[in-house]
Amino acid sequence: MEAVVLAGGKGTRLRKAVAGLPKSLAPIGKHPFLSYLLGWLRAQGVTDVILAVGHRRTDIVRHYTRHKPQGMRLRYSIETTPLGTAGALRNLRSMLDGEEFLVLNGDSIFDVNVRRMLSFHHRHRAETTLALASPPEAARYGSVLLDARSRVKAFVEKHTDVLPREDGKPGASKWISGGLY
C-alpha cells in the first residue's frame, strides 16, 4: 500500500513553537512529529510513502536521509511553489505505482484502521473515501456536510451559519475531516 503525506505547509501558526523548522519536523518528545506519523503508517501496513514537500523541504529530506525509517521506502515530490492539495497530487501522480493510495495531512494523526477504511471504500465502490471525526468542539474546525447517504455535500471553513447542518438546522456540521483520504 502506498501513501502520500502532504508535508509542504509553512506552519505559520506554529512558527514560534518550532523555531524555524517545518511543522512536520516539530519535535514531540525525542522525535519529529512526522516520524510518529510514518511509524503509524508502517503499523497499518503502509511501507511505500511519498512525502510531498515544499516549504523548508531540504530540512525534511536531510532529516530522513540521515534517519531513514526501517522497512519503509520514502520518496519525495518537491514543490517549488505552493500547489495546494490537488496540485501536490497532480505534481506527483507519475510517482504512484497504482491507482489506490492513501493521502494524509502531514500535521495530524487520526487513528483509523486503514484496512477497515479500505474495506468500506471497496464495499461502497467509492471514488474517494474521507475519514471523518466528530470532536466535542467541532465548530472550532472546518466542517464537512454530508447528505442522507453519507456522501460529502460541502466543505465549510471554520464555524459558520451560512449552510445548514445535516439535520437542516443552522450551524456547523458535527463532522470534520481527519486529514486521511
Which residues does each predicted region cover?
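Conserved N-terminal catalytic core of the sugar/cofactor nucleotidyltransferase
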Residues: 1-5, 13, 27, 31-105, ...
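Short, flexible helix/strand-to-coil boundary loops that buttress conserved ligand/catalytic motifs
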Residues: 18, 64, 156
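Short alpha-helical oligomerization interface
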Residues: 19-24
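Conserved core of the sugar-phosphate nucleotidyltransferase
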Residues: 111-181
